[in-house]
Regions:
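Extracytoplasmic gate region of multi-pass secondary transporters
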Residues: 10-69
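Residue-level signature of mid-helix packing/kink "hotspots" within the transmembrane helices
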Residues: 58-66, 117, 148-152
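Helix-to-loop junctions at the C-terminal end of transmembrane segments
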Residues: 64-77, 163
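Structural signature of the two symmetry-related core transmembrane helices
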Residues: 80-94
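Paired small-residue
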Residues: 92, 103-111
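Intracellular juxtamembrane helix-capping segments at the cytosolic ends
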Residues: 118-131
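A late C-terminal transmembrane helix in Major Facilitator Superfamily
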Residues: 130-167, 175
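Multi-pass alpha-helical transporter architecture, strongest
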Residues: 175-207
């Protein structure tokens, strides 16, 4: 059993864990993507500026997706790579709460884009590493389906809380909480994988 050998978990447990983790990161991811233009408008900047910031986020996300995941994934594996990108995403979502000057928002947009762009492409890598190769397509699709639900939930949370509070700050704080939830899950999987590798090496050394 590949998942048990590498993580000490059943195939189903790994599938469910990754699905839940994907919801956490994608709730956080969706908030700036869905509400950046409106948020910037609330800060006194025009819609054109908001659109430029959104375009900048998407452009830098493309850099991470096309180059960053391959670079880090080859060296550190899928779990550590997604931990890096999810950490960057969460950090700059938190920074967005306090960014009010335009240059600060541009800086946040660049680094948030670099972070979020590398998150979703890591899930197929992780599925391929830890789940049966013959089931990669189906299991990746299930994870991405849950991630899509997280995107929808994050977008809705942002709008619903804005209607109540008149600000996106609370929504961004909740998004950071979801991001931390994702990091805790991924960090736990990294810990389990490291422990399993040590156990295998100790078993080989004792023979």
């Amino acid at each position: 059993n590949r998942s048990f050998d590498l993580l000490g978990l059943s195939t189903l447990a790994v599938q469910i864990t990754l699905a839940i983790a994907s919801i956490g990161c994608c709730v956080a991811m969706a908030l700036p993507l869905a509400h950046m233009v409106a948020h910037v408008s609330d800060l006194g900047y025009d819609y054109e500026t908001g659109a430029q910031l959104l375009a900048l986020m998407l452009a830098t996300a493309g850099v991470s997706a096309f180059f960053g995941v391959g670079f880090f994934g080859k060296r550190y594996g899928g779990l550590k790579t997604i931990f890096i990108f999810s950490g960057i995403q969460g950090l700059f979502l938190f920074a967005l709460i306090f960014a009010d000057h335009l240059w600060m928002i541009y800086l946040v947009a660049i680094f948030f884009g670099l972070g979020y762009g590398g998150v979703l492409p890591c899930y197929p890598v992780i599925v391929r590493e830890f789940l049966p190769a013959s089931q990669v397509g189906r299991r990746t699709a299930l994870v991405i389906l849950c991630a899509s639900g997280g995107m929808a939930l994050g977008s809705w949370i942002g709008g619903a809380l804005y209607d109540v509070t008149g600000s996106y700050s609370l929504a961004f704080i909740i998004g950071v909480g979801f991001n931390i939830f994702n990091l805790v899950i991924i960090g736990h999987l990294i810990h389990r994988n490291t422990r399993q590798k040590k156990a295998v090496l100790q078993g080989i050394a004792s023979k």
